[in-house]
Amino acid sequence: MKFAVIVFPGSNCDRDMYHAVKEVAGAEAELVWYTETDKLEGVDGILLPGGFSYGDYLRSGSMASTSDVMHKIREHAAKGKPVLGVCNGFQILTESGLLPGALMRNKHLSFMCHQEELVVEDNQTFFTSLYEKKEVVRFPIAHGEGSYFCDEATLKELQANNQIVFTYKNNPNGSIENIAGIRNKQGNVLGMMPHPERAVEELLGSDDGLKLFKSMIANWRDSYAINA
């Protein structure tokens, strides 16, 4: 499986993501500057890493969401191919309309950087099939605008369609219904605020994130590779 890790001006978790998928999970990966849209041809999975794209001007993820590379990413997603957005990547996905809702300022209005326990709410996804349902995992968080919000109608739709993939055990930022990560209806786009790429080696305090990337690789082999 070949991943493209998209690098925007202000991204700062791109090398963590690259290390996680290539050097730990063993997949093929390339760092792709946001203007190099031609490099997305032939890519199997797209990863939008964390950071502060465009300095978080206007709103977190807002400016990146209008860049040309996002048109390519929409096309990629429309084909059913996987897209993962982490932290700022999640913000970009909501700003671009690939995922519903929005990320707002943390309830205490401060930047948060520590380990958090999450609950795997749905293990029947492209991204979570190697986890157990309701498994508790530990991922780092590092954000100032990570409080997930959506209106009541959208929340009911997320719940009805099993689109809530991860929740916080101890909601650190005020996210509605403790939401830490959601997927689209089709199931091939996942956005989450916690950082699985920073939880792939016990040396860093947890390797719980490794199963997310291995789930992606295993499911790609079972589906896209067979149908290629």
From Swiss-Prot:
UniProt KW keywords: ATP-binding, Cytoplasm, Glutamine amidotransferase, Hydrolase, Ligase, Nucleotide-binding, Purine biosynthesis
Pfam families assigned to the protein according to its UniProt record, in alphabetical order: GATase_5
Entry annotation: catalytic residues: C87 (nucleophile), H195, E197
Origin: domain of life: Bacteria
SUPFAM superfamilies: Class I glutamine amidotransferase-like (SSF52317)
Location of this chain's protein in the cell: Cytoplasm
A GO term from the CC aspect: cytoplasm
E.C. number(s) listed in UniProt: 6.3.5.3, 3.5.1.2
Glutamine amidotransferase type-1 domain segment(s): 3-226
Pathway assigned to this chain's UniProt record: Purine metabolism; IMP biosynthesis via de novo pathway; 5-amino-1-(5-phospho-D-ribosyl)imidazole from N(2)-formyl-N(1)-(5-phospho-D-ribosyl)glycinamide: step 1/2
BP GO terms, sorted: 'de novo' IMP biosynthetic process
InterPro entries, alphabetized: Class_I_gatase-like, PRibForGlyAmidine_synth_PurQ
Catalysed reactions, semicolon-separated: N(2)-formyl-N(1)-(5-phospho-beta-D-ribosyl)glycinamide + L-glutamine + ATP + H2O = 2-formamido-N(1)-(5-O-phospho-beta-D-ribosyl)acetamidine + L-glutamate + ADP + phosphate + H(+); L-glutamine + H2O = L-glutamate + NH4(+)
GO molecular function, one term: phosphoribosylformylglycinamidine synthase activity
Gene3D superfamilies: 3.40.50.880
HAMAP family assigned to the protein according to its UniProt record, in alphabetical order: PurQ (MF_00421)
Subunit annotation: Part of the FGAM synthase complex composed of 1 PurL, 1 PurQ and 2 PurS subunits.
Protein name: Phosphoribosylformylglycinamidine synthase subunit PurQ
Record organism: Oceanobacillus iheyensis (strain DSM 14371 / CIP 107618 / JCM 11309 / KCTC 3954 / HTE831)
